[in-house]
Amino acid sequence: MDRQVVVEARAWLGTPYVHQASVLGAGTDCLGLIRGVWRGLIGAEPEAVPGYTADWSEASGREELLGAALRWLVLKPLDAPAAGDVLLFRMREGAVAKHLGIQSETGDEPRFIHAYAGHAVVESPLSDPWARKIVGRFAFPLKG
């Protein structure tokens, strides 16, 4: 399923960034991208997503994205990268994890696909500054 995840995620490239959205070609945020790939590969989303603010519960310290990832995705070791992995990022020390992406390439030039706030879904180098922020690595569950 790894390459299928990347193909599905790349279909979202260029989709404008829209907070709380998940509509291919019209608008999405980082969670919306993961939701859209889920729908494309697996089917209906496993739970309704409540409204959320851009700070992702930072004031309360609740790890909402991490909790959802642990409920619905398959946890992987951080040091076992594969194309198609869902990546969870903690943007700064002490903050909640609040950004998601999908690893598209591994090896000497790793890359990931993510919804870039204020812009669109892009494929970016998974440079050292980004890689150091990864706090979770997950796989989509197998269908069925």
Q: What is each stretch, according to the model?
A:
Residues 1-78, 83, 90-92, 96-98, ...:
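N-terminal capping segments
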Residues 83, 108, 133:
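Residues that flank catalytic or metal-binding motifs in active/ligand-binding sites
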Residues 100-123:
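Catalytic Cys-His active-site segments of thiol-dependent hydrolases/isopeptidases
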